[in-house]
């Protein structure tokens, strides 16, 4: 399958949040970029100020609210929007998308579509049939088949400050991986390739849960030993649920797995880590979410994974404990005691 566009064509970015803006600025070092903002007013405001999410825009970036313009101008597009919004966005863009497009998303969350307008209930078992990764959403809602995922330890603030980092572009198609590497790789940003698309996507989604747990440990002042315990057992929990959902264990021990987990569980700039810290201080989850400018994907992921674990009979004690804290069924102190008393057996039994 040949590409319609030449290397001189601009690249699209869907989403003008902190990470979307970082990606747009990075791409603009090599090519023209069209950055999509969710409303005409926001697009105009960003264009006028030449700033988005506290970051100055590169001169090669144009901001728009026109999805048709993005699709018709760009062969390669990076969707970077919250998971709860991606399906609706791709559905609106679908009339303009064609099989020649390449979409590489940077969203670390699940899509849940339940029959008969049912609401997600974490205490009700939920099968994989109703839970989709972002690449699956893109392929369901459009004619695009060349889909990829950008994942790894990519804290937006550090990348905006031009500090060194690395990421993974995962796809079943080599040309998608090559496109991601050619467009994004530079002297401070390494890009690795991985053919395990589902595994890499699951890494990015599931680590957000553990990051909230690490934030709780930090908020309680329990020290580095406790955080190391939480992170290492969290990795095991990620692998258990990841295997149940079709992921390969190898992805979890790479940059998109353990790499992203370490970064997100160690940085007070991580939104999910911040949620955990504030929960430990006694704030209610509704107050925390309302006060945050951008989405902390881990909160919703906890409820989804709790339901999935019920269906697949996978014990996820960290997820269960965080679910109980969020829903005020257990205090933070009681949840910590619960985890310390949990009957873990062999340390490693997934290899």
Language model segments and positions:
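NAD(P)+-binding Rossmann beta1-loop-alpha1 motif at the extreme N-terminus of oxidoreductases
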Residues: 2-65, 69, 92, 135
């Amino acid at each position: 399958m040949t590409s319609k566009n030449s290397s001189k064509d601009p690249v699209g970015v869907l989403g003008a949040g902190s990470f979307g803006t970082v990606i747009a600025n990075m791409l603009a070092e090599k090519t023209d970029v069209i950055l999509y903002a969710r409303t005409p007013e926001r697009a105009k405001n960003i264009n006028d100020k030449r700033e988005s999410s506290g970051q100055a825009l590169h001169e090669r970036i144009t901001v728009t609210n026109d999805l048709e313009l993005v699709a018709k101008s760009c062969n390669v597009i990076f969707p970077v929007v919250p998971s709860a919004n991606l399906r609706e966005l791709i559905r609106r863009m679908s009339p303009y998308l064609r099989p020649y497009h390449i979409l590489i998303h940077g969203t670390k969350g699940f899509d849940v579509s339940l029959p008969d307008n049912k609401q997600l209930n974490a205490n009700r078992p939920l099968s994989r049939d109703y839970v989709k990764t972002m690449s699956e959403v893109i392929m369901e809602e459009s004619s695009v088949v060349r889909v990829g995922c950008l994942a790894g330890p990519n804290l937006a603030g550090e990348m905006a400050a031009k500090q060194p980092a690395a990421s993974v572009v995962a796809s079943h198609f080599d040309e998608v991986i090559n496109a991601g590497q050619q467009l994004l790789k530079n002297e401070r940003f390494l890009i690795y390739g991985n053919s395990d698309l589902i595994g890499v996507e699951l890494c990015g989604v599931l680590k957000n849960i553990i990051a909230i747990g690490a934030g709780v440990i930090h908020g309680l002042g329990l020290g580095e030993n406790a955080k190391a315990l939480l992170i290492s057992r969290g990795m095991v929990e990620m692998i258990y649920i990841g295997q149940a959902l079709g992921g390969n264990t190898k992805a979890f021990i790479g940059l998109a797995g353990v790499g992203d987990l370490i970064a997100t569980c160690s940085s007070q700039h991580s939104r999910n880590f911040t949620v955990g810290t504030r929960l430990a201080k006694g704030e209610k989850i509704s107050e925390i979410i309302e006060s945050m400018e951008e989405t902390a994907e881990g909160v919703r992921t906890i409820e989804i994974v709790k339901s999935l674990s019920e269906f697949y009979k996978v014990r996820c004690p960290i997820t269960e404990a965080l679910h109980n804290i969020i829903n005020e069924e257990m205090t933070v102190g009681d949840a910590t005691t619960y985890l310390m008393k949990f009957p873990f057996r062999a340390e490693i039994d997934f290899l």
